[in-house]
């Protein structure tokens, strides 16, 4: 069975994103936590802070989620004014100064920022071209945009695991693919999309291998896609449990379960 691309509306539905998917930080935290077992370990907030070394003034984190990057930038660069914003009110929680905002229409004056962050979020934006124009609009001359996403080759082992588990549940050789978030804006596609606004784009590749000896981190990652459970064409909970069994079987046979990762940041000017 050939994997079918995830329909755009499943990944960009603002109502779903602001409630089931990111109404709280629970699911995002589950996806982030899987990287605890990655080698080499990449300090993503630290990389952002390093890239902001020459930036002064205000920095917006568009699609800031649970504020992981906001907290680090505020800690390491107290001289910067950090503006957190996200489409979901719920996930913003108690982040000081956060506001609900749409990346396609940023509530920021033209040329007001020294930098803007758009980290693992442009694949959720319906009109990516408009969002990229907005990123460019709000930057002062010489300002930078830092964007992140995954490669189309990222975590293919998890896609294979899901389809095998789904096939087991359905009684067929291989089940349907799960919702793939970053497929709408991959590392391979990003330079062309960002290049419509930015003249200089530098990619920082972040490869690694996740290796676990306990199924739970992988299961938690898969379960974090619960917001799309009724869109996957397979009983969600049953597939999760079958995936758990398959991961445990691999660990028993091979000593661990491995996932190959490739994400990256793009620094744009």
Task: List each model region and its residues.
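Conserved class I S-adenosyl-L-methionine
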Residues: 2-56, 68-69
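Short catalytic micro-motifs in class I SAM-dependent methyltransferases
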Residues: 120-124
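Conserved catalytic/acceptor-binding region of the Class I
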Residues: 129, 136, 141-212, 229
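A structural alpha-helix within SAM-dependent methyltransferase catalytic domains
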Residues: 49, 71, 129-136
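A conserved beta-strand element that flanks and buttresses the S-adenosyl-L-methionine
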Residues: 117
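Class I SAM-dependent methyltransferase SAM/SAH-binding core
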Residues: 57-105
């Amino acid at each position: 069975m050939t994997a079918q691309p995830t329909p755009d509306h499943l990944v960009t539905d603002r109502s779903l994103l602001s409630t089931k998917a990111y109404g709280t930080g629970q699911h995002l935290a589950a996806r982030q936590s899987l990287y605890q077992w990655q080698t080499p370990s990449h300090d993503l907030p630290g990389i952002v802070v390093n890239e902001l070394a020459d930036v002064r003034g205000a920095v917006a984190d568009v699609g800031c989620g649970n504020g992981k990057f906001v907290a680090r930038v505020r800690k390491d660069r107290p001289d910067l004014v950090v503006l957190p914003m996200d489409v979901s009110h719920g996930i913003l929680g108690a982040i000081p100064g956060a506001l609900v905002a749409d990346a396609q229409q940023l509530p920021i004056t033209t040329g007001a920022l020294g930098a803007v962050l758009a980290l693992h979020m442009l694949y959720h934006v319906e009109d990516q071209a408009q969002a990229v124009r907005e990123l460019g609009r709000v930057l002062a001359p010489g300002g930078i945009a830092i964007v992140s996403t995954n490669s189309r080759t990222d975590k293919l082992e998890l896609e294979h695991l899901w389809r095998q588990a789904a096939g087991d549940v359905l009684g067929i050789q291989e089940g349907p693919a799960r919702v793939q978030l970053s497929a709408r804006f991959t590392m391979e596609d990003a330079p062309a999309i960002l290049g419509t606004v930015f003249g200089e784009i530098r990619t920082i590749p972040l490869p690694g291998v996740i290796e676990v000896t306990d199924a739970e981190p992988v299961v938690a990652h898969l379960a974090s896609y619960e917001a799309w459970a009724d869109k996957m064409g397979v009983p969600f909970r049953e597939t999760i449990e079958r995936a758990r069994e398959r991961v445990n079987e691999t660990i028993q046979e091979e000593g661990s379960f491995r996932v190959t990762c490739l994400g990256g940041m793009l620094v744009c000017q």
